[in-house]
């Protein structure tokens, strides 16, 4: 987990004073390691909790690829939306071998509660996942040996398990 931005006031039209934007990465052993999915179920849950709420902006989405850097000069707070991903913080670049991230929900939806600012919980019998297909460039660790899994903005304390 890495503190990406610490906010001390208004960003755009939103007061983010006291909020911190974190980015969570999978740390890999090798540059060519591949992260295909983050999944959870009732035996091995995946969760990212906050003691308050996660900042969600209407111009964002549940996936990092929903972020559009072209709007950030006009709506700067949208850059700090909370989302999940496999290696993307904006739309996939197909010419570079990147592929969009897909989501599956189980019996208990996790996307809608998370998009409403709640904690992310994947812990039911069917499980849930966000994933990319094998070979997508955005799942490859690269020189820094890490793959971005999500961005989370909160003014609370976070804990989690992936």
Task: Tell what function each PLM region has.
Residues 1-162:
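Non-catalytic macromolecular-recognition regions in eukaryotic signaling proteins
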């Amino acid at each position: 987990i890495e503190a990406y931005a610490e906010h001390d006031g208004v960003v755009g039209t939103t007061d983010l004073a006291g909020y911190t934007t974190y980015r969570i990465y999978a740390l890999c052993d090798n540059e060519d390691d591949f992260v295909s999915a983050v999944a959870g179920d009732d035996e091995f849950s995946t969760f990212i909790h906050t003691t308050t709420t996660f900042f969600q902006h209407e111009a964002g989405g549940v996936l990092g690829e929903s972020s559009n850097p072209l709007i950030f000069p006009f709506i700067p707070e949208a850059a700090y939306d909370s989302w999940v991903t496999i290696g993307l913080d904006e739309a996939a670049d197909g010419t570079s071998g990147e592929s969009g991230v897909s989501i599956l929900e189980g019996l208990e939806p996790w996307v809608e509660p998370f998009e409403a600012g709640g904690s992310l919980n994947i812990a039911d019998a069917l499980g849930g996942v966000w994933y990319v297909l094998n070979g997508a460039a955005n799942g490859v660790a690269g020189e820094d040996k890490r793959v971005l899994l999500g961005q989370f903005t909160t003014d609370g304390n976070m804990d989690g398990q992936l």
